[in-house]
Curated annotation (Swiss-Prot):
It comes from Clavibacter sepedonicus (Clavibacter michiganensis subsp. sepedonicus). Its EC number is 2.5.1.78. Belongs to the DMRL synthase family. 5-amino-6-(D-ribitylamino)uracil binds at residues 28, 59-61, 82-84, 115. Keywords: Riboflavin biosynthesis, Transferase. Catalyzes the formation of 6,7-dimethyl-8-ribityllumazine by condensation of 5-amino-6-(D-ribitylamino)uracil with 3,4-dihydroxy-2-butanone 4-phosphate. This is the penultimate step in the biosynthesis of riboflavin. This is 6,7-dimethyl-8-ribityllumazine synthase. The active site is at 90 (proton donor).
Length: 160
C-alpha cells in the first residue's frame, strides 16, 4: 500500500484558527470523491479553519479554480479528484495537466495546495484510499492536514 510510512494524522493537534481553506473537489467517481471530501472536511473542522467547498466537473478543472481561490484570499486549497486509467491516453493527459497546474497554482501564489488527486489503475485502489469505512487510507484527510500544516508553517516563516 502506498501509505506505508505515512505519519499518523491527529487533526485535534492542528490549530488552524484564522485560516481560510478552500476545498476544490471533482465530481467524477462519486463514492470515492465523497469519501475524500468527508475526510478533508473532518480534518478542517477539527482544525478550526474557515472552510469553503467548491465542486468542479472533473480533475482537469481543479487547477484554475484552485488558483482563483488562492488569488481571492484563501490561505490554502485542498484539491480532491479521482482519475482512473482507461484504454486511451486521456488518463496521462488529465493527470499530468492537473498535477502541473496545481503545482503552478501553489508556486505562483506562494500558498499551499494539499494534493488529494488520486491517479488510479482501477476503482478498487480509489476505494482503498477514500477514507470509507473499509478503506485502508484516507487521502482526503491527508491532503487537508498537509494544506493546513503547510499554511501554518508559511505563516510562521513569514512572521505573519
Amino acid at each position: 500500500m502506498s501509505g506505508h510510512g505515512a505519519p499518523e494524522i491527529d487533526p485535534t493537534a492542528l490549530d488552524g484558527t484564522g485560516l481560510a481553506v478552500t476545498v476544490v473537489a471533482g465530481r467524477w467517481h462519486d463514492e470515492i470523491s465523497a469519501g475524500l471530501l468527508a475526510g478533508a472536511q473532518r480534518v478542517l473542522d477539527a482544525a478550526g479553519v474557515t472552510t469553503t467547498v467548491i465542486r468542479v466537473p472533473g480533475s482537469f478543472e481543479l487547477p484554475v479554480v484552485a488558483r482563483a481561490a488562492l488569488d481571492a484570499g484563501a490561505d490554502a486549497v485542498v484539491a480532491l479528484g479521482v482519475i482512473i486509467r482507461g484504454g486511451t491516453p486521456h488518463f496521462e493527459y488529465v493527470s499530468d495537466a492537473a498535477t502541473s497546474g496545481l503545482t503552478q497554482a501553489s508556486l505562483l501564489t506562494g500558498k499551499p495546495v494539499g494534493f488529494g488527486l488520486l491517479t488510479l489503475d482501477d476503482e478498487q485502489q480509489g476505494l482503498d484510499r477514500a477514507g470509507l469505512p473499509d478503506s485502508k487510507e484516507d487521502k482526503g484527510a491527508e491532503a487537508a492536514e498537509a494544506a493546513v500544516t503547510t499554511a501554518l508553517l508559511l505563516k510562521a516563516i513569514r512572521g505573519a
